Amino acid sequence: MGARGNHTVDTSKQLAALRELMKKENVDVWVVPSEDQHYSEYLAHCDERRAFISGFNGSAGCAVITLDKAYLFTDGRYFLQAEKQLDSNWTLMKQGLPDVPTWQDFLHKTLDGSLKIGIDATIITEEDAAGLRKNLAPKKSELVPSKKNLVDIVWGSERPARPQNPVFHLDEKYSGQSFKEKVKKVREEIAKEKGKAFVVTMLDEVAWLFNLRGSDIDYNPVFFAYAVVTPDEVVLFINEKQLDDAARDYLGQDVKIRGYDELYDYLKELPKSLSLTGDKDGEKILVTSRTSLAITETITPPSSPESTTFHKVVRSPVGDLKAIKNAVEIEGFRQCHIRDGAALARYFAWLEEALNEGKEVSEYAGAEVLEKYRSELDLFRGLSFTTISSTGPNGAIIHYSPDPQDCAIIKKDQVYLCDSGAQFSDGTTDVTRTWHFGTPRPEEVRAFTRVLQGHIAIDTAVFPNGTTGYLIDSWARRSLWQDGLDYRHGTGHGVGHFLNVHEGPQGIGVRIAYNNTALKAGMTVSNEPGYYEDGQYGIRIENIVIVKEVKLPNNFGDKGYLGFEHVTMCPIQTKLIDASLLTEPEKKWVNDYHQEVWQKVSPLLQNDKRALEWLKRETTPI
């Protein structure tokens, strides 16, 4: 999501120091991806290497540094932010635009040949490394995986320490399933793949598997750990001091605890202890495509005979199981979104009144008030990402978030976009609403209405089992395309249950990965089409929806059919809707949705007359 601060950072000193190290290590290029050793999207501060070396702190991007140049690759969500943050040392590579290569293609297509390209082996996957090696070979360039991270050395004593915050047990009245039941299902999936073990590397998967939560990464209730599941044992690799007494008691004798740094020693011996032969058709240690090269080369050392491999890359059984919420989790999603809706109503009512009274409210101050209202809700555990509170042109910066020292004042005559969310013991929320507190311009109303039509198209979609989010993404864009408009981000991402607000493998968008995962009943995804006019405004309407089974008059092919249940409960501003563009079913959808919001949220606002009156007005039928 957003990242605080949009100032340019002078990176001359750190680049000079890095280049000196590169010369000592005999590498011509150093690659700095966004990810940490767990392939996390959002990072602990100690792992924000790309932000440290480049000054760009968006959540997606890759830095490529040569001995005389530096390049930052990122996607359309972050073009404007990167332009603001990068200094003159850097060239911004706008991935997705014509003739702009990916960073991987850049290394072998654009750079000279006969180069040594260095990267930390713990933050590149085996698959990516193999692809790079294959493409670099014709140019006689070489990938040099390193056991040390040169950026960490440059960062030195100023690098933040790795967090070791308390880890606690999430009660089964919220999780809906014991960790023993989850492990049993994982073992069944391991057996189907002729596996003898599965290495769990993703932090949200470790947390979900053991019904544990932490706070080692801001906004993400996870903790630094790995796990290995075999037919006979379950091992959790964690700093044991982080486990509180209740968590330790919950795991009991069923889980062996080893130090976080002991994983590699354990994996080195695992093929032997499992009596694996390494034969092509033999049993394997299962890993996912997001497992680091350092881990896979520990399991199957590069020195092994060519025909010998002790590991196999598979879809994560934990990720697939986690994506489908159980009945308890689904009910938690419904309830936490109703409570969240009350906080949103209180905030938007307060903000409107403040602006009408001529008070100055900065983007950051607004976000602080919204957090205050949320913090008063039952089961609140914190925000789920940095609030994107953006007025006018800042709304066009898709993942903008306000700098407390230097942000805009929210203006009545500008579009205001607010994308925010919270963590609760019973679920995770993520909601975007777009408002105008004055008189919107006709082009703003038309664009908003087109975005709304795309939102309704996804919300009301019906599709057969086996359909992917890749396939239905265009339904959200069709109405925008009719006006020659579009947006440079996905339509929806998976959402964790009191876990990461961005969850895979499910999603709605044009990423090829979304075509590999069919939408299934119980999955949770966002529905968030938008439109952004650079330098002027941004529009986005986002609800969280749950995939559900639907009963239809027919059932062609005996496939069974699916649809969506929206759980987000917050009005969509009717002032910004051109009702003449809507079909009758679309108008009915708006009115039905607003009636539902009123019925579910108004009982929670009986002690806030201002918010109650605001909600009544904003849910009036069109």
Curated annotation (Swiss-Prot):
Enzyme class: hydrolase
GO biological process entries: proteolysis
Membrane-spanning parts: none
Pfam families given in the database record: Creatinase_N, Creatinase_N_2, Peptidase_M24, Peptidase_M24_C
Keywords from the UniProt entry: Aminopeptidase, Hydrolase, Manganese, Metal-binding, Metalloprotease, Protease
Positions that bind Mn(2+) 2: D419, D430, E542
Stated name of the protein: Probable Xaa-Pro aminopeptidase P
UniProt source species: Coprinopsis cinerea (strain Okayama-7 / 130 / ATCC MYA-4618 / FGSC 9003)
